[in-house]
From Swiss-Prot:
One of its GO terms (molecular function) is ferredoxin-NADP+ reductase activity. Keywords: FAD, Flavoprotein, NADP, Oxidoreductase. This is Ferredoxin--NADP reductase. FAD binds at D39, Q47, Y52, V92, F127, D296, T337. It comes from Albidiferax ferrireducens (strain ATCC BAA-621 / DSM 15236 / T118). Homodimer.
C-alpha cells in the first residue's frame, strides 16, 4: 500500500547505503546536515554485503585488512552520532525539480521527500549479476547454481565448480581450497582462457595449488549440463581443442561480474556516459545542480573505482552542497583532531593538552 502523507522535508537524500553512501552520511554530518538514506536492499552495506561479506579488503587506509561485513559495521558505528534515517527495501523511482529549487523524491514504497540536495551513491545501480547463458540451467539457480556467496559454510564439503576469471572467482576458489570449516571436498576452476583479470598473487597461488593437485583449472567454456532426478550432476565444458567433457559437481558458482543497470536513475535527465553519471571533480555535481554522484556510479577523467576514492568524493560533495543547503553560512575547514565544534557533533570529549 502506498503512503501518501505529506513529504518528509530534509536537507539531503542519499540514494544507496553501501560504504560510500554510509560515508556520505558522515561527511554531511560533520557539516551538521542530517540525511535520509534509501536503498533497494533490505540492509546496509551494498555490494560489500551482497557480494563479498566475508572476503578480505586490504586497501582501506589505516585498516590492514577487514571484510565487507566488518567495514559496513564500522561505518555504521562511525555515523551513529548523526542520526541518519534509513529506508530499506525501496528504490527511488521519481525525482522532480520543484519551483523553489528543492527536489520531490518518491520511492517504490511511496515514501516521499522534499529535499534540498540528492547524493547518488548507488554503486553500479541495480544488482544484476551477469549470468551463464546455457538454456535450461536457470532452473537450478539458488539451489545448485549461485552467482554470489552469502554464507561460505553452505558450500563446505561440496564438490565445487567455479566459473570466471576475475578476482571474485579466484578469491573464492582459493578460499574454498584452504583448510578450515568452509573447505570444499574439491574445487575446479573454469575460465575461457588461460589469462585472468585478477590479482597476480591470486593467480600464482591458484597455479601452485593446481601443481600440488589440491585443485584443478580447466580452460574452456560451459556449453551444456547434465541432470538426473531434477538435480544438476555436471556441466559440459568445451575446450579450445573442440572436445566437450563433462565435469561432475555438487554446486556451480559463477562469477562474471555485474551488469550495470541504472534503473530509474537513467530517467532523471542527468548526463550519462557508459551507464555512469558524469560529474565535475570540484564538488562531484552532476549536470543538475543540487544532485551529486559519488562512488562507482560516477565517471570523470582519471576515475578509479575504489572505495577510498569514493570516500574522498564524499567529502568534496558535502562541501559542495553547503551553499545550496545553507547559503547564509560560511563554511570553514575544521579538523576532527582539534575542533571543539566537531567533537560536540561527534559526541566526544575535547582532549586537554598540558
Amino acid at each position: 500500500m502506498r503512503n501518501h502523507q505529506d513529504p518528509i522535508e530534509t536537507d539531503a537524500v542519499i540514494v544507496g547505503a553501501g560504504p560510500v553512501g554510509l560515508f556520505q552520511v558522515f561527511e554531511l554530518g560533520l557539516l551538521e546536515i542530517k540525511a535520509h538514506v534509501v536503498d533497494s536492499l533490505a540492509y546496509p552495506g551494498g555490494q560489500c554485503i551482497e557480494l563479498y561479506p566475508d572476503k578480505p579488503i586490504y586497501d582501506i587506509p589505516a585498516v590492514p585488512v577487514c571484510t565487507g561485513r566488518e567495514l559496513t559495521q564500522n561505518l555504521l558505528k562511525q555515523i551513529a552520532p548523526f542520526g541518519a534515517t534509513f529506508h530499506y527495501g525501496q528504490e527511488v523511482t521519481v525525482v522532480e525539480k520543484q519551483s523553489d529549487g528543492r527536489f520531490f523524491v518518491e520511492t517504490s514504497k511511496g515514501t516521499r521527500f522534499l529535499s534540498k540536495t540528492i547524493f547518488i551513491a548507488a554503486g553500479v545501480g541495480a544488482f544484476q549479476p551477469r549470468t551463464l547463458k546455457v538454456d535450461g540451467l536457470e532452473v537450478f539457480e539458488d539451489s545448485q547454481l549461485f552467482y554470489r556467496v552469502r554464507n561460505p559454510a553452505d558450500f563446505a564439503d561440496k564438490n565445487l565448480v567455479i566459473v570466471g576469471g576475475g578476482d571474485s572467482a579466484l578469491d573464492w576458489a582459493l578460499d574454498f581450497v584452504k583448510d578450515g570449516p568452509n573447505k570444499a571436498a574439491s574445487v575446479i576452476l573454469i575460465h575461457r582462457r588461460d589469462g585472468f583479470k585478477a590479482a597476480p598473487a591470486s593467480v600464482a597461488k591458484m597455479r601452485e595449488l593446481c601443481d600440488a593437485l589440491e585443485m584443478q583449472f580447466i580452460v574452456g567454456q560451459v556449453t551444456g549440463f547434465e541432470a538426473q532426478d531434477s538435480l544438476l550432476t555436471g556441466i559440459k565444458v568445451t575446450g579450445a581443442d573442440g572436445v566437450t567433457r563433462v565435469v561432475p559437481l555438487d554446486v556451480l558458482l559463477v562469477f562474471f561480474g555485474l551488469s550495470p543497470k541504472l534503473g530509474p536513475i537513467a530517467e532523471w535527465g542527468l548526463d550519462i556516459e557508459r551507464k555512469q553519471l558524469k560529474v565535475d571533480t570540484e564538488k562531484f555535481s552532476t549536470s543538475e545542480p543540487g544532485i551529486f554522484a559519488v562512488g562507482d556510479i560516477n565517471i570523470y577523467p582519471g576515475k578509479k573505482k575504489l572505495i577510498l576514492s569514493g570516500f574522498h568524493e564524499c567529502a568534496l560533495a558535502a562541501f559542495g552542497a553547503m551553499p545550496i543547503i545553507s547559503p547564509e553560512k560560511k563554511v570553514f575547514l575544521q579538523y576532527t583532531t582539534t575542533s571543539p565544534k566537531l567533537h560536540k557533533v561527534l559526541g566526544v570529549e575535547s582532549p586537554v593538552f598540558d
